[in-house]
Amino acid sequence: METLASRLDACQETLLELYEKDSNKLEDQIKHWAQVRLENVMLFKARECGMTRVGCTTVPALTVSKAKACQAIEVQLALQTLMQSAYSTEAWTLRDTCLEMWEAPPKRCWKKKGQSVLVKFDGSCDRDMIYTGWGHIYVQDINDDTWHKVPGQVDELGLFYVHDGVRVNYVDFGIEALTYGVTGTWEVQVGGRVIYHTSASVSSTQAATSDDDTLSPLRSAAAAVTATATATTAVPPTLQDSAQAPSSPPPKRQRVIVGQQWQQPDSTRKVREGQVECQNDRSIRNPDSTDPRRGHSDLDAVPVIHLQGEANCLKCFRYRVQKHKDVLFVKASSTWHWACGNGDKTAFVTLWYKSQEQRAEFLTRVHLPKGVKALPGYMSAFV
């Protein structure tokens, strides 16, 4: 016990020295999280041995120490990969690398230069919410673990960033309006200035034209979007603290797509369930090729979609859309495979919907990753 107490004291002394040093070097932040990990590992072991106190330190429950140790391991590994990137020489403080910053939206990304974004739902001060937009967002590529620095952006649809030409929303004002608003309208303010104000419903929102003074705290994001996106949509402002170029009003309405931004379809064009356009090998199959709107004999059947594709890709996609649960779908399954048959290792994730209308809305709004197929169908309802 004395050996454990002395090691714990040494670990805590190292942590105090790091706090007093208040370094802005990334290697010191990695060392800090390594010590946090070691501290919780020792407390976990002490609790396993039946100890409730080690010196002056109260030993927490096993689950508490285990959870904190796992969090420390996750952050430490993320910082170690960041150390191998081109951004390791930037200033990284304890505040920049804390757990709260790691888990703040967008989750599992590093963020800098936060700025408050005020959104008034229904135009009422009683229904306003404050969100944090980030000037710089450090995103890790899921394929090769490399880090990329992208600017945080804001428009009338929400807070987002663009990575590899794909728009990733981490705050969707339309979905937030379902929670905090009634009429489906809202107003976005950055730095005390109104940059967008909606006067119609969520589905027909148009950005208000802003002058140079209104957009003065923001900067054009033309360098952050692809040539295709800039050719069809307005360039949203970023949240970086630098000079900006005025943006032009969007020529057409826009709609938020999970993981990407698509142009709103023409109002004269009807999209029927099971007939959503697919691009880049993303296809949607009909459960019944003769009539996609067929009835179902089982009164307890509920509409579902089986997403088919590579297991890791499906897991990442499910993680991205789970924040929109109850709005775009009811629940999602874990990744599953067929146990026997033709030996195909294709994975599936099943999404459950409360109605055919909700499923149709999902197919219309959600952008599927490349290689993922959506297979609509029905399942018997069960708890």
UniProtKB/Swiss-Prot annotation:
InterPro entries recorded: E2/EBNA1_C_sf, Nucleotide-bd_a/b_plait_sf, Papillomavirus_E2_C, PPV_E2_N, Reg_prot_E2, Regulatory_protein_E2_N, Regulatory_protein_E2_N_1, Regulatory_protein_E2_N_2
Annotated Gene Ontology cellular component terms: host cell nucleus
Region of interest called DNA-binding domain, as start-end residue ranges on this chain: 303-383
Top-rank taxon: Viruses
Primary localization class, coarse: host cell
Subcellular location: Host nucleus
Region Transactivation domain, residue ranges: 1-202
Comp. bias (Basic and acidic residues): 267-297
One of the protein's GO biological processes: DNA-templated transcription
Region annotation (Disordered) ranges: 233-297
Family statement drawn from the similarity comment of this UniProt entry: Belongs to the papillomaviridae E2 protein family.
Subunit and interaction comment: Binds DNA as homodimer. Interacts with protein E1; this interaction greatly increases E1 DNA-binding activity. Interacts with protein L1; this interaction enhances E2-dependent replication and transcription activation. Interacts with protein L2; this interaction inhibits E2 transcriptional activity but not DNA replication function E2. Interacts with protein E7; this interaction inhibits E7 oncogenic activity. Interacts with host TAF1; this interaction modulates E2-dependent transcriptional regulation. Interacts with host BRD4; this interaction mediates E2 transcriptional activation function.
Name of this protein: Regulatory protein E2
Native species: Human papillomavirus 57
